[in-house]
C-alpha cells in the first residue's frame, strides 16, 4: 500500500468513526437497539455495510439499516436466509463463508455480525483486523479468552464498536443509567437481578407445561438429513464436529448446548 493509499484509508476511517460516535448519541431514541449506532438523521454520507448473518436477528438488523445505509455485502451459511436478503439487495455481493467477505474489505466501512453465538468472536475479530467498525449481537464472545482477544484487537483498530442488547439501548434504560450516574438515587450499594426462565434439562411434557419452546434432553445420538441450502460444516465453524440433528436447527435450540451457545443468560 502506498503512502497516499494509507492516508486515504486513515481519512476514511476517521470520518466513519466520527459518524459512528455521533450516531451512538442518537441511538437512545430507539426502543430496539438493532444497529442503532448506524441510524443517524441528517447525515449526507452513507456507510457501506457488510452483513454477516442475515436470518433471525440478522434479518432484523439488516432491516433496521437498509433504509439509511448501503448494503454492499451479505453473508449467511443458510442459502434460504441469504436468498431472502439478497432479493431486497440485488446489488450486494453474497457469500456463505464469512472469511471470504474480507477478500473484498475495501468495499465496506462497517460490519454487522448476527451469526450464531459461537462464531460471533471470529467474525468480529476479522472485521477489527481489517479496520472495520463493528456492531455485534450479544453475547460478544463465547469465552473469557475470546473476550480478551477481541478487546486487544479493538484497542488496536481504534474503530467504533457496539454490542447489540436490543431494548437496553432504549431511551428509558438510558434515562435510568443517567440518573444513577448523576447520583440522583445516591450511592448504589447493591443490585438485585433475576430472570424468569432457565433452560434446564426438560422432558417434552415439562416443556409444554412451562410453555417452553423446545424440550432439552440428552444430546441426540442419531442424525437427521441436513436441510437443503444449509452448509452445516460452515455453521459449526470452530465448534467440534457433530452430526446434524433437527433438535439443533432451525430455530432457537442450538444455544442450549455449550459448544454453540451460552444458555439462558445469553438469550436475555
Region locations from a protein language model:
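N-terminal Rossmann-like dinucleotide-binding module
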Residues: 23-89, 167-170
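N-terminal Rossmann-like NAD(P) cofactor-binding module of classical short-chain dehydrogenase/reductase
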Residues: 111-112
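N-terminal secretory signal peptides and thylakoid transit peptides that target proteins
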Residues: 7-27
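Beta-strand-loop-alpha-helix segment that lines the small-molecule cofactor/substrate pocket
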Residues: 116-117, 121-169, 176, 183
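Short amphipathic alpha-helix with an adjacent loop that forms part of the alpha/beta core around
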Residues: 100-106
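Short, solvent-exposed loop/turn and secondary-structure capping segments
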Residues: 60-64, 84-87, 122-126, 146-147, ...
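Predominantly a Rossmann-like dinucleotide-binding segment in NAD(P)-dependent oxidoreductases
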Residues: 53, 57, 157-162, 167-268
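Conserved SAM-binding strand-loop segment of SAM-dependent methyltransferases
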Residues: 93-97
Amino acid at each position: 500500500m502506498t503512502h497516499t493509499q494509507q492516508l486515504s484509508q486513515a481519512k476514511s476511517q476517521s470520518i466513519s468513526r466520527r459518524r459512528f460516535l455521533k450516531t451512538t448519541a442518537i441511538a437512545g431514541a430507539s426502543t430496539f437497539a438493532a444497529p442503532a449506532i448506524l441510524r443517524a438523521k441528517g447525515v449526507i454520507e452513507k456507510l457501506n455495510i457488510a452483513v454477516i448473518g442475515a436470518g433471525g436477528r440478522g434479518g432484523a438488523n439488516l432491516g433496521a439499516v437498509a433504509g439509511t445505509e448501503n448494503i454492499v455485502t451479505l453473508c449467511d451459511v443458510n442459502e434460504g436466509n441469504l436468498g431472502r436478503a439478497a432479493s431486497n439487495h440485488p446489488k450486494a455481493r453474497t457469500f456463505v463463508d464469512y472469511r471470504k467477505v474480507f477478500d473484498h474489505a475495501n468495499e465496506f466501512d462497517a460490519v454487522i455480525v448476527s451469526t450464531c453465538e459461537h462464531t460471533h468472536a471470529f467474525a468480529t475479530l476479522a472485521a477489527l483486523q481489517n479496520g472495520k467498525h463493528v456492531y455485534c449481537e450479544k453475547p460478544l464472545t463465547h469465552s473469557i479468552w475470546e473476550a480478551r482477544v477481541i478487546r486487544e484487537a479493538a484497542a488496536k483498530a481504534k474503530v467504533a464498536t457496539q454490542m447489540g442488547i436490543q431494548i437496553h439501548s432504549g431511551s428509558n434504560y438510558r434515562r435510568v443509567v443517567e440518573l444513577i450516574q448523576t447520583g440522583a438515587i445516591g450511592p448504589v450499594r447493591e443490585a438485585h437481578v433475576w430472570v424468569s426462565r432457565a433452560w434446564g434439562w426438560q422432558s417434552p411434557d415439562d416443556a409444554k407445561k412451562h410453555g417452553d419452546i423446545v424440550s432439552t434432553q440428552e444430546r441426540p445420538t442419531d442424525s437427521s438429513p441436513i436441510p437443503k441450502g444449509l452448509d452445516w460444516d460452515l455453521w459449526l465453524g470452530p465448534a467440534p464436529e457433530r452430526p446434524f440433528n433437527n433438535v439443533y436447527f432451525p430455530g432457537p435450540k442450538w444455544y442450549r448446548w455449550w459448544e454453540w451457545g451460552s444458555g439462558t443468560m445469553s438469550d436475555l
